[in-house]
């Protein structure tokens, strides 16, 4: 049988990435050009800057991917690209590049949901036994997705307000940390203790939903109130603050994940998204998820990358191109959700 090679593009936010996947499991290359340093001074991603960086880097990434994989365009089976969700301008850069490459080389074009990519990154690590549950946590999303069988996605829970990663970044700003602050908060948390009684929203409800806005507000209010008393709690107790905040986030994520798995019994639990790099969350999952297979991708596959997009595209390709192939009128879908697939 002829080998399957998928060239994938990911430009949904602030990483320009191009990857080539062989036969759905062998990642030949996963080129990532990060823009973090360009966004740090703004405390978050600036869409216009992100788009300009994608334009500058996309061709370089394509050339690097083909060179590293030692693959020529005529060996490729298909081109895949993130169509959403994400920043509109950023998505369009990747989509235009993918459409141009596909058209020029007479290749089919497969659109991919960015969150399906985060989910299917697990398939690059281990075999997913179905049915499966996925906890997807990032700067823009916190959701639980039930995967009854390969390529079937049902969102069963999500955040009502802030995503977990968004809460980390906002709290990090209050702490005086540079963007992105999740890794630093995680490191500080491991040096401190859970000494502050921060709220765990919706812990006692039977709804598979998250809420982190109350936690964020409680953190900000505590810091403000302590400052009013003359206690610079950020300077005096930063590690315990970080530990208490992270404990609250992880408690909620764990509780709702377990609730989802009670409602939808599964064989595998997958974790994906940028926040899945959090060591505190990884430790809790490894300690408490013992009856189901647990797949946690390595750090290189947690953030945005085209390798995961290729993995999700391979699943779509197996459904038959007549069912999944996009035309050259493919457009960005910044608010794409699983229900739209």
Curated annotation (Swiss-Prot):
Cofactor(s), names only, from the UniProt record: Fe(2+)
Cofactor, free-text remark: Binds 1 Fe(2+) ion per subunit.
Residues at which substrate binds: 136-140, 169, 182, 186, 278
Keywords: Acyltransferase, Cytoplasm, Iron, Metal-binding, Transferase, tRNA processing
UniProt KW Plastid keyword: no
One GO term describing the cellular component: cytoplasm
Swiss-Prot/TrEMBL catalytic activity: L-threonylcarbamoyladenylate + adenosine(37) in tRNA = N(6)-L-threonylcarbamoyladenosine(37) in tRNA + AMP + H(+)
Superkingdom field: Bacteria
EC number of this enzyme: 2.3.1.234
One of the protein's GO biological processes: tRNA threonylcarbamoyladenosine modification
Subcellular location: Cytoplasm
Pfam family, one: TsaD
One Gene Ontology molecular-function label: N(6)-L-threonylcarbamoyladenine synthase activity
Residues at which Fe cation binds: 114, 118, 304
Summary of the function given for this chain in its UniProt record: Required for the formation of a threonylcarbamoyl group on adenosine at position 37 (t(6)A37) in tRNAs that read codons beginning with adenine. Is involved in the transfer of the threonylcarbamoyl moiety of threonylcarbamoyl-AMP (TC-AMP) to the N6 group of A37, together with TsaE and TsaB. TsaD likely plays a direct catalytic role in this reaction.
UniProt family annotation: Belongs to the KAE1 / TsaD family.
Stated name of the protein: tRNA N6-adenosine threonylcarbamoyltransferase
Species this chain originates from: Lactococcus lactis subsp. cremoris (strain SK11)
């Amino acid at each position: 049988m002829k080998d399957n090679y998928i060239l994938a593009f990911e430009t949904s936010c602030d990483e320009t990435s191009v990857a080539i996947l062989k036969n759905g499991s062998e990642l030949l290359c996963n080129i990532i050009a990060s823009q973090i340093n360009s966004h740090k001074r703004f405390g978050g991603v600036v869409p216009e800057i992100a788009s300009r960086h994608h334009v500058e880097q996309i061709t370089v990434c394509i050339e690097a991917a083909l060179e590293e994989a030692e693959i020529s365009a005529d060996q490729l089976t298909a081109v895949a690209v993130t169509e959403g969700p994400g920043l509109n301008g950023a998505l369009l850069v990747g989509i235009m590049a993918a459409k141009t490459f596909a058209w020029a080389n007479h290749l089919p074009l497969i659109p991919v949901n960015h969150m399906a990519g985060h989910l299917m990154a697990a398939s690059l690590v281990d075999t997913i036994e179905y049915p499966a549950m996925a906890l997807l946590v990032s700067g823009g999303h916190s959701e639980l997705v039930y995967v009854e069988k390969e390529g079937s996605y049902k969102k069963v829970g999500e955040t009502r307000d802030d995503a977990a990663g968004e809460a980390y970044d906002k709290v990090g700003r209050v702490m005086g940390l540079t963007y992105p602050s999740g890794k630093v908060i995680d490191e500080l948390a491991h040096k401190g203790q859970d000494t502050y009684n921060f709220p765990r929203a919706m812990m006692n409800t039977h709804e598979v939903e998250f809420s982190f806005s109350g936690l964020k507000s409680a953190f900000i209010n505590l810091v403000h109130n302590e400052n009013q008393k003359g206690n610079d709690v950020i300077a005096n107790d930063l590690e315990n603050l970080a530990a208490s905040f992270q404990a609250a986030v992880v408690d909620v994520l764990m509780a709702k994940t377990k609730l989802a798995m009670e409602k939808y019994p599964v064989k595998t639990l997958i974790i994906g998204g940028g926040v899945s790099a959090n060591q505190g969350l990884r430790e809790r999952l490894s300690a408490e998820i013992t009856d189901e297979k647990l797949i946690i991708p390595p750090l290189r596959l947690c953030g945005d990358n085209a390798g995961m997009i290729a993995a999700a595209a391979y699943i779509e390709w197996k459904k038959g191109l007549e069912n999944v192939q996009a035309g050259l009128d493919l457009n960005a879908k910044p608010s794409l959700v699983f229900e739209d697939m």
